[in-house]
């Protein structure tokens, strides 16, 4: 009898573990996350204080200022001076926080999040890498 009860309990447990979750409506999931601002710049608004994008180009400078962004944090390890090239003369704080894509440590993530929080005292922050995918996605997700 005890063996029978054990088998029934195990069967119920396994059935519960294998039951698929209800599909989530993609539109409501994305509405809770980031909202697209400019597709060709891979620019998204995470919240009132954080934006994410790929490497900004000169044409993005005006929009960045219109959004009230005050700080631009570059996560790129190579070609770190592109912000100065594309965004010079703008009323923006340009900061470098290089992350080596294949060697990011928890300490690097924590320091980057601290820098974002510190810069948000001056206004919204834009964080980016080259494509706005891996490094930017990691930092945005941890934020």
Predicted features along the sequence, with ranges:
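Positively charged n-region of N-terminal signal peptides that target proteins for export
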Residues: 1-4
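Short cysteine clusters
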Residues: 129
């Amino acid at each position: 009898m005890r063996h029978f009860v054990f088998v029934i309990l195990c069967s119920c447990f396994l059935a519960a573990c294998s039951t698929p979750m209800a599909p989530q409506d993609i539109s409501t999931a994305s509405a809770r996350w980031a909202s697209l601002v400019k597709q060709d710049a891979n620019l998204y608004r995470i919240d009132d204080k954080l934006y994410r994008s790929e490497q900004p180009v000169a044409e993005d400078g005006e929009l960045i200022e219109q959004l009230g962004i005050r700080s631009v944090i570059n996560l790129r390890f190579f070609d770190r001076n592109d912000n100065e090239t594309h965004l010079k003369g703008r009323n923006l704080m340009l900061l470098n926080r290089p992350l080596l894509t294949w060697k990011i440590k928890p300490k690097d993530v924590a320091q980057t999040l601290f820098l974002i929080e510190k810069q948000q005292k001056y206004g919204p922050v834009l964080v980016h890498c080259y494509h706005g995918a891996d490094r930017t996605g990691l930092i945005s997700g941890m934020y």
